[in-house]
Amino acid sequence: MKYENFNKELEFITNERLRNNAMIILNNLPDYFFQVQAASTGKYHPSYALGEKGLIRHTKAAVCIANNLFNIYKFDEHTKDIILISILIHDGLKHGFEYQQYSKFEHPLLIGQLLNNIKNELTLTEDEIKEISTNVSSHMGKYNTNN
């Protein structure tokens, strides 16, 4: 199963229902997500995130950073779990639904579409889907667009 690339990171999600949903979402990501480097041009990510499976390493690093921040900033467990799911899938459609050579500028917005496409497989509430979609859609800050 695709989610097995993130077994350690999935253990950080304390709620079993949310963890199971994260696994379902990860399994619905395109195969390329689990093979490509984090940056198609190599410009915007550190060297550890380049090369084969770099996007996996990038995602693992982001989860690690979040867990360290959780020691400083206090969130309830549900919020932490939603943040972790968001991080795990934030670049899941980086090259679109079908692989394209370069990153899709609007890739953060595509996750919301994916979640809506598979919501019958999920036990997430509408609010949880919206929160995850919002988290992911804003992960590029001012470099993001929704037009």
Indicate residue ranges for each PLM-predicted region.
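Acidic/His-rich, divalent-metal-binding segments that scaffold phosphate/diphosphate chemistry
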Residues: M1-Y99
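Short, amphipathic alpha-helical segments
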Residues: I56, E77, Y102-L109, E126, ...
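Histidine-centered active-site/metal-ligand motif
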Residues: H58, H90, H107-P108, H139-M140
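An active-site-proximal "capping" alpha-helix that borders the catalytic cofactor pocket
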Residues: A62-A66, K104-E121
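Inter-helical turn/loop segments and adjacent helix faces that build the functional surface
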Residues: I72-E77, K119-E126
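Histidine/acidic-rich helix-loop-helix segments that form or flank divalent-metal centers
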Residues: I83, L122-N147
